[in-house]
Amino acid sequence: MSRPVVVFEYGSGNVHSAVKALEAAGADVELTRDRRRAQEADGLVVPGVGAFAAVVDRLRAAHGDEIIERRLAGGRPVLGICVGMQVMFERGTEHGQETAGLGEWPGAVEPLCAGVVPHVGWNAVEAPADSVLFDGVWDERFYFVHSYAAQHWTLEATGPFPKPRVSWAEHGSRFVAAVENGPLSATQFHPEKSGSAGLRLLANWIGSL
């Protein structure tokens, strides 16, 4: 049976490709900003494109920060995509301006240290051997479009959850490509634009709900 998944519609970018990919991966998908529906779904997907500060502002205006916090407190899965991953960190720095994120993870999102920015294209991802998301797609490449990333990871095991599984990619220097941390997972790349590998990754997440 399909698992009910909400893609949170809060005004950040084109979410329809995420909806279609999640449906193709086996989810029963609803696109909504309704707080009750977002809270009750088996899984919540938080996409995001554009500037860190603008995404944070839109999320908060739609009470997305409260929804995410309540879901995580109850152990209910959340998946962030691209800037939807970035805003889970404590802060983001763009054009010299620092903006507070949602603070689910310590650390900062900063400009990529690369000669060519933005980073647009397909990259390999170095995932831990016990990753659930990357099961079956260890050697695949995923599609990235970004100029900023978290380039350090400091969080270890917290509370009842095991040590986070952190995956890495490289563009100029290493950066965090994906995180699996209890009920909160996220990808810097776009699984919905990553072909069959992205669909398998989404199916792995759906299967874990």
Swiss-Prot record:
Domain Glutamine amidotransferase type-1: 4-209
EC assignment: 4.3.2.10, 3.5.1.2
InterPro entries membership: Class_I_gatase-like, GATASE, Imidazole-glycPsynth_HisH
Sample GO molecular function, one term: glutaminase activity
Record flagged with keyword Hydrolase: yes
SUPFAM superfamilies named in the record: Class I glutamine amidotransferase-like
Active site location: C82 (nucleophile), H190, E192
Compartments, as annotated in UniProt: Cytoplasm
Gene coding for it: hisH
GO biological process: L-histidine biosynthetic process
Keywords assigned: Amino-acid biosynthesis, Cytoplasm, Glutamine amidotransferase, Histidine biosynthesis, Hydrolase, Lyase
Catalytic activity from the UniProt record: 5-[(5-phospho-1-deoxy-D-ribulos-1-ylimino)methylamino]-1-(5-phospho-beta-D-ribosyl)imidazole-4-carboxamide + L-glutamine = D-erythro-1-(imidazol-4-yl)glycerol 3-phosphate + 5-amino-1-(5-phospho-beta-D-ribosyl)imidazole-4-carboxamide + L-glutamate + H(+); L-glutamine + H2O = L-glutamate + NH4(+)
Main location, first listed in the record: cytoplasm
Assembly notes: Heterodimer of HisH and HisF.
Keyword Electron transport: no
Name of the protein described by the UniProt record: Imidazole glycerol phosphate synthase subunit HisH
Role of this protein: IGPS catalyzes the conversion of PRFAR and glutamine to IGP, AICAR and glutamate. The HisH subunit catalyzes the hydrolysis of glutamine to glutamate and ammonia as part of the synthesis of IGP and AICAR. The resulting ammonia molecule is channeled to the active site of HisF.
Lineage: superkingdom: Bacteria
GO cellular component terms listed in the entry, alphabetical order: cytoplasm
Pathway(s) this gene product operates in, as recorded in its UniProt entry: Amino-acid biosynthesis; L-histidine biosynthesis; L-histidine from 5-phospho-alpha-D-ribose 1-diphosphate: step 5/9
